[in-house]
């Protein structure tokens, strides 16, 4: 059933979560200019958290009431369970990042936080707005504009430490790679528009289906245009070979920003990728019996991304850089769901995104806690003996590392189980090849995750005194470890909920 199309005025009620973020961003600017200096930072944090709570709460309300799908603003945006699910995810992730920046100290970014606090929190809220738009876009032009909104703000956040050479280098590399990927993606969109004469994804799907039925195969123009568009999507999710910016940007950016980039924009990239391929190139874009090239294309992309990420992570000495390559590998795991191009595959991707947010945010939070107490040291040496110096934080990190590896009883194991199950359920030799490569990559990842575990618990440190960890930072890390374990032993309701949220996609 096609969603009901609403005009601009009627759409505003369903656009309320984004309107809250827009109003809050404007209010933050006013507060930054007019508030007393001693109240400024606390007010910015409170206003940001309140706005995110309202935005995420509205998304949760729409999910709970199972509101009927709508096409907002004459078909530009989708209002459905999928977009509302990601509204909640983005609000939670952004709220966690705001908590990372709570006074009295924000690791790696304290001087900039005190000097440019208004700009920082405003940018974070607008970035959350852009991610919401990415997940809901059903029009090629809005996909491009929302992706660029997220990208431009990410550039600024990566270079927020203006007096730090690494941060400036990270921002410059991010801009260069982002600009090239953006141009290539826009070029691919022009091919899709040229062959379909439309920018709405549903109309593109109908036109592509007609051409595919007429020719008996997917038109070459559609394949080439989609391949160009994948450059832009691949850049956002750090898929090989568009991943080269990721290690330098993650290492050079302030750690709270790195934590955000590793989960927020990446999840948004997968959301818009799911939306585009489901609505424009899904089941309705080709008649029965006509083979499409997308499973093979995504299978190759997944294998390359997993392998590059895991092999590169093996030789890293900086934990933050290691986690950057780890995030590349996890993008490869999530791409496994696209290689089968089925409802089960999409549900597995969405569930893996939920679990990945918990374990990756938690891992970066522990890195921040360690760097905060070691003078900014983010290498393996700073983690020596952490199991004795800060046992709770080390235990939380152990949970995150086990989950990132994909071992039971953690959420990462269940996430990978559903991904591989969807892959093998598709059948065929190609699915088995991809599955074997995926399992081998999981084994490779065990080496560098286990290396950090060994460093924390078996290596001795010159420091024997307990490591003081900021209560909010350590407490939040331990709190994130709870759902990471809980979803490894009792995942059914969450998976069923996520699967229902993506079931309306083609």
UniProtKB/Swiss-Prot annotation:
A single Gene Ontology biological process assigned to it is:
ATP synthesis coupled electron transport
Q: Which InterPro entries match?
A: NADH-Q_OxRdtase_suN/2, ND/Mrp_TM
Q: Can you name a GO cellular component term? A: plasma membrane
Q: Which reaction does it catalyse?
A: a quinone + NADH + 5 H(+)(in) = a quinol + NAD(+) + 4 H(+)(out)
Record keyword Cell division present: no
One of its Pfam families is Proton_antipo_M
Which residues does UniProt call coiled coil?
none
EC assignment: 7.1.1.-
What keywords are assigned to this protein?
Answer: Cell inner membrane, Cell membrane, Membrane, NAD, Quinone, Translocase, Transmembrane, Transmembrane helix, Transport, Ubiquinone
Where would you find the membrane-spanning parts of this chain?
11-31, 44-64, 82-102, 117-137, 140-160, 175-195, 222-242, 254-274, 289-309, 323-345, 356-376, 394-414, 419-439, 472-492
Recall the GO molecular function terms of this protein's record: NADH dehydrogenase (ubiquinone) activity; NADH:ubiquinone reductase (non-electrogenic) activity; quinone binding
Q: Where in the cell is it found?
A: Cell inner membrane
Domain of life according to the entry? Bacteria
As for family, the record states:
Belongs to the complex I subunit 2 family.
**In UniProt terms, what function does this protein have?**
NDH-1 shuttles electrons from NADH, via FMN and iron-sulfur (Fe-S) centers, to quinones in the respiratory chain. The immediate electron acceptor for the enzyme in this species is believed to be ubiquinone. Couples the redox reaction to proton translocation (for every two electrons transferred, four hydrogen ions are translocated across the cytoplasmic membrane), and thus conserves the redox energy in a proton gradient.
Q: What is the name of this protein?
A: NADH-quinone oxidoreductase subunit N 2
Which species does the entry assign this protein to?
Answer: Sorangium cellulosum (strain So ce56)
């Amino acid at each position: 059933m096609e969603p009901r199309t609403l005009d601009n005025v009627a759409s505003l009620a369903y656009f309320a979560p984004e309107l809250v973020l827009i109003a809050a961003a404007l209010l933050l600017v006013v507060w930054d200019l007019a508030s007393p200096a001693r109240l400024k930072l606390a007010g910015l944090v409170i206003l940001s958290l309140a706005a995110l709570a309202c935005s995420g709460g509205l998304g949760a309300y729409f999910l709970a009431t199972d509101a009927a799908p709508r096409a907002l603003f004459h078909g530009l945006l989708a209002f459905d369970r999928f977009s509302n699910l990601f509204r909640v995810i983005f609000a939670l992730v952004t709220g966690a990042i705001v908590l990372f920046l709570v006074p009295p100290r924000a690791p790696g970014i304290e001087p900039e936080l005190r000097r440019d606090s208004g700009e920082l929190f405003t940018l974070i809220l607008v970035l959350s707005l852009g991610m919401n738009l990415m997940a809901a876009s059903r029009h090629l032009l809005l996909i491009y504009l929302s992706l660029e909104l997220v990208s431009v703000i990410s550039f600024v956040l990566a270079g927020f430490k203006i007096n730090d050479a690494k941060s400036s280098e990270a921002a410059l590399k991010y801009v260069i790679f982002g600009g090239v990927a953006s141009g290539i993606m826009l070029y691919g969109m022009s091919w899709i528009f040229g062959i379909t004469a439309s920018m709405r994804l549903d109309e593109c799907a109908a036109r592509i289906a007609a051409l595919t039925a007429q020719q008996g195969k997917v038109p070459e123009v559609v394949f080439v245009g989609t391949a160009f568009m994948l450059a832009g999507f691949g850049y956002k999710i750090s898929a090989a070979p568009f991943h080269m910016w990721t290690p330098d940007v993650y290492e050079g950016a302030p750690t709270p920003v790195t934590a955000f980039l590793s989960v927020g924009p990446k999840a948004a990239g997968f959301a818009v990728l799911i939306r585009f391929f489901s609505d424009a190139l899904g089941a309705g874009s080709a008649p029965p019996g006509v083979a499409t090239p997308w499973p093979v294309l995504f299978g190759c992309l997944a294998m390359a991304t997993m392998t590059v990420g895991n092999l590169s992570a093996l030789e890293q000495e900086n934990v933050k850089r290691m986690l950057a390559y780890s995030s590349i590998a996890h993008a490869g795991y999530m791409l496994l769901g696209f290689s089968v191009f089925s409802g089960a595959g999409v549900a597995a991707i969405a569930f893996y995104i939920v679990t990945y947010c918990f374990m990756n945010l938690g891992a970066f939070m522990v890195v921040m806690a360690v760097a905060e107490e070691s003078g900014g040291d983010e290498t393996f040496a700073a983690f020596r003996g952490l199991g004795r110096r800060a046992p709770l934080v080390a235990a939380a990190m152990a949970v995150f590392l086990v989950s990132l590896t994909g071992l039971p009883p953690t959420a990462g194991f269940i996430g990978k189980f559903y991904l591989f199950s969807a892959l093998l359920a598709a059948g065929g030799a190609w699915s088995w090849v991809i599955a074997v490569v995926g399992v081998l990559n999981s084994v490779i990842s065990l080496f560098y995750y286990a290396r950090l575990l060994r460093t924390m618990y078996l290596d001795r440190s010159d420091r024997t005194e307990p490591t003081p960890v900021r209560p909010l930072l350590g407490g939040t890390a331990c709190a994130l470890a709870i759902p990471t374990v809980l979803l490894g032993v009792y995942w059914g309701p969450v998976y069923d909920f996520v699967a229902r949220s993506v079931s309306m996609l083609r």
